[in-house]
Amino acid sequence: MTLEAIRYSTGKLVIIDQLQLPYVEKYIEVPTSKDAWHAIKKMRVRGAPAIAIVAALALASELHTLMAHDKLSNRAEEVRLFIQEKLDYLVSSRPTAVNLSDAARKLAAHVSDHAEMPNSTGRAVAEAFIQAAEEMLAKDLKDNTNIGKYGAEWIIRNALAGGRSKATILTHCNTGSLATSGYGTALGVIRALASKNALAYAYCTETRPYNQGSRLTAYELVHENLPATLVTDSMVAALLAKAEAAVDAIVVGADRVAANGDTANKIGTYALAVLAKFHGVKFLVAAPLTTIDRSTKSGADIVIEERPASEVTTIKGAVETESSCDRIKLETVRIAAEGIHVWNPAFDVTPSALIDAIITERGVVERGTDGRYNFDGIFEDHSAF
């Protein structure tokens, strides 16, 4: 059974607290945009698609509560301004992930259209927002399934060597059910391969310093009983050089893809792409169209979020003794010398020249004969939500 990171019914949003994983599966309510901002900032929820959905649904829940208690203005323009203010606030929680700003822009335009309608009311504007946010949730799940399908098909056609019928895949960070509405992007490709009986093995990186790979991706792989092994980030070169490992492709997600294909993703992705190029391993990015930002010309224009030094100098985990592992008692311990300076960018940018293909819900985009990515065709008739 696939994990549920997001549980939603109209007026109530609940998310799994990813800071407690993999030790405790605890769900917390996110009733307001303020709660969503803190959940995103503290990384109780993470993954570009997931944070956009949580932000939208938290504001939808807040609007529903205000209407239920008759605390929402009946003036359409006042409600529109209220929504815009909340969306701007939510976007500030994680600036690198384009899905959040893209969703905010589309939702703001949607409610503006409704606010400008003749005889529009505050309730009508709020209800339009709620409906659009709920549609985002459903669409993301459908899109992820398609990403998995197209990615698996591409790998079977292009990445398998020696007549083999099953692929060995390495992935980075967490891009599964915990990072999306469900199924996942890069991890969704692994799921799709498994569903086709075309997955030989999966490797996931630890993903320092926040350990999303060891805490979350490994948790999902174990939860679904998929054949997998955890490696530290620094072991990947040795793994790719190991003939018996026979890694066919590295598949990663993305927080922002620029118009030229340069991709911002979890720190360490760039290094994986360089290693893949050297070892002749296919390097693929799996991301929905909402992650592709055609207004950003190249990776040089992407703002990279920097995280607190404590994420590098300390580590949190369950207390383990020789006889047992206490899954409830979590402790934070220091692992670096006090006084050392820390640089902790959350993301890096992989140049498009190192990326073999970008997998979307509309299909797989490869570089053209000029060696460049062009997304124009795949964006034709792309709807707002």
UniProtKB/Swiss-Prot annotation:
Molecular function per GO: S-methyl-5-thioribose-1-phosphate isomerase activity
Give the pathway annotation.
Amino-acid biosynthesis; L-methionine biosynthesis via salvage pathway; L-methionine from S-methyl-5-thio-alpha-D-ribose 1-phosphate: step 1/6
Q: Which GO terms describe its cellular component?
A: cytoplasm; nucleus
Q: Which GO terms describe its biological process?
A: L-methionine salvage from methylthioadenosine
* EC top class, as a word: isomerase
As for what it does, the entry says: Catalyzes the interconversion of methylthioribose-1-phosphate (MTR-1-P) into methylthioribulose-1-phosphate (MTRu-1-P).
UniProt record similarity statement: Belongs to the eIF-2B alpha/beta/delta subunits family. MtnA subfamily.
Annotated positions for site Transition state stabilizer: 173
Location(s), subcellular: Cytoplasm; Nucleus
Q: Which InterPro entries match?
A: IF-2B-related, IF-M1Pi, IF_2B-like_C, Initiation_fac_2B_a/b/d, M1Pi_N, NagB/RpiA_transferase-like
Cited Pfam families: IF-2B
- Positions of the catalytic residues: 255
EC number(s) on file:
5.3.1.23
Q: Which reaction does it catalyse?
A: 5-(methylsulfanyl)-alpha-D-ribose 1-phosphate = 5-(methylsulfanyl)-D-ribulose 1-phosphate
> What name does UniProt use for this protein?
Methylthioribose-1-phosphate isomerase
List keywords of the entry alphabetically: Amino-acid biosynthesis, Cytoplasm, Isomerase, Methionine biosynthesis, Nucleus
The primary location reported for this protein is cytoplasm
